[in-house]
Regions:
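A short helix->loop->beta-strand "cap" motif at the edges of active sites that frequently abuts
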Residues: 100, 138-139, 174, 279-283
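Acidic-and-aromatic substrate-binding clefts and catalytic sites of carbohydrate-active enzymes
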Residues: 50-56, 76-87, 109-123, 147-156, ...
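N-terminal pre-domain/capping segments
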Residues: 2-3, 8-14, 21, 25-139, ...
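Short amphipathic alpha-helices and their capping/turn segments at secondary-structure boundaries
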Residues: 87-96, 129-134, 163-167, 240-245, ...
Length: 315
């Protein structure tokens, strides 16, 4: 039987190349599920999943999130020192009145290209952002956007900026982290090296993986990582490999699939959760970007909750 690592890597290759079809799904072993009482498990939601369906009526939307069964939320949408149309303290009250707890937030600095000339500007932005998120009661600030990285010098500067953001955040009693997509798993050439190109280049990996350089180049006391397991697979990597390689640095997960959790057949969530629990990871957030036709985002996030709430492998 194929190892879980080889299997996940093969599935991700099919997915990226656009070759994956429904016939692949039966290859996955059936996951045993047992019914549980809704809301007994602590399941978090990244509110980006809901888009306008939430922002059009935040108070009603937050209550709906709670009714579905979610316990915690991870914020998105901070800008100009506000959460959408709301002052941060007002937004926090809306969330808490709905019976939810804000435990994390995604925020991106205004600069994507880091230079020696704009690092002070970025640092000042983090200082005011931290101040606002203290008012929101957030325990973690997470950057989900990858800065421009083309070479090792770029990585070095990015890591310095990340460490600085971590220092600012730590001083306020919070933690600072980074969230990946697929781009972080690209490779950059080592000095004197040329990366392979053309057909089959992906089968001849060389160079350094940006994600690894980020983890290895940042201070463990200042920077943690929130792994998006779906985007890791889409980056041609196996989440299990990284959970094994960086058991202390990866502290939070984004649980995501191509659409509603468990429907694509391409994500081995059972093994991912088992390894996460072994590593001591207990917090995760559902993220849903796309739903099928004739389904609302709220219906989609409910489907995700139901999948996790009835899965025997989720504590």
């Amino acid at each position: 039987m194929e190892s879980k690592i080889y299997f996940l890597n093969k599935i991700s290759l099919f997915s990226v190349c656009g070759l994956m079809a429904g016939s692949i799904a039966p290859v996955l072993a059936a996951t045993k599920s047992v019914p549980t009482v809704a809301g007994k498990k602590v399941i978090g939601l990244q509110i980006y999943s809901l888009g306008k369906e939430l922002t059009e009526n935040v108070p009603a939307g937050m209550k709906k999130i709670k009714e579905i069964g979610y316990s915690t939320i991870e914020l998105a949408g901070y800008g100009n020192r506000k959460m959408g149309q709301y002052e941060v303290s007002e937004y926090r009250k809306i969330v808490e009145d709905a019976g939810l707890k804000i435990t994390s937030a995604h925020v991106n600095p205004p600069e994507r290209k880091y230079t020696s000339e704009n690092t002070t500007k970025i640092s000042d932005w983090w200082k005011q952002t931290v101040e606002d998120h203290v008012k929101l009661g957030v325990g973690r600030l997470i950057q989900p956007g990858m800065p421009t990285i083309e070479n090792h010098d770029d990585v070095k500067l990015v890591c310095e900026v990340f460490n600085n953001a971590g220092e600012i955040t730590k001083a306020a009693g919070m933690k600072w982290g980074y969230h990946n997509h697929n781009m972080e798993f690209k490779r950059i050439a080592k000095p004197g090296e040329t990366l392979p190109t053309g057909p089959g280049a992906i089968l001849r990996p060389t160079g350094d993986v940006v994600y690894d350089l980020m983890v290895d180049g940042t201070n463990p006391d200042l920077v943690f990582f929130e792994m998006d397991v779906y985007w890791t697979v889409m980056g041609q990597m196996d989440p299990l490999d990284y959970l094994e390689k960086y058991p202390k640095r990866i502290q939070v997960l984004h649980i995501k699939d191509r659409s509603v959790l468990g429907q694509s057949g391409m994500m081995n969530f059972e093994n991912i959760f088992k390894k996460a629990y072994t590593n001591g990871i207990s917090e995760f957030y559902v993220e849903l970007e796309k739903v099928k036709a004739n389904m609302t985002q709220f219906e989609g996030v409910k489907g995700c909750f139901d999948y996790l709430n009835t899965a025997a492998f989720v504590k």
